[in-house]
Amino acid sequence: FAAGLLEAKPARPLVFAHRGASALRPEHTLASYAKAILDGADYVEPDLVATRDGILVARHESNLIDTTDVARRPEFSSRRGKKMVDGEWHEGWFVDDFTLAELKTLRAIERLPKVRTGNTLYDGQFQIPTWEEIIDFVAAQSAASGRIIGLVPELKSSTYFRDAGLALEDRFLSTMLA
């Protein structure tokens, strides 16, 4: 995770790409992370949630309604529901109701289309990446750029996923120890 970047006082401020370059590409996509790295990010900060089959993927929250094309996908209309996440009720489609294979058929969209209108040009172009794909991608970007690029993952809604039988911590640790 490039811990060495934090051991010495850096010559310049470190740049952390929260959700990647989410002002320029749909958040939490490899394209968003690539743009952030190209623009000089030292760290990529992916938020992680779990699919029904226990695979960690990058999404800011468990509800897919605002960041994917799921609402336009009739084959998944019956999965719309209402769930309590982190003490609040949310209505939509939830990542833990989809297997990774199903999730990979969805495409990312801009979460704030009225604010970041330029990002809507990329709607439907990118898949939701897994944690392992992100690790591999950032490692390849580090090698290609000749500089260390770190990862600062955030496990989202841990209690919600634990109660669903999908404890994020165990999955995260098993990936890191593999």
Give each language-model segment a name.
Residues F1-A178:
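Phosphate-group recognition and catalysis centered on beta-loop-alpha active-site segments
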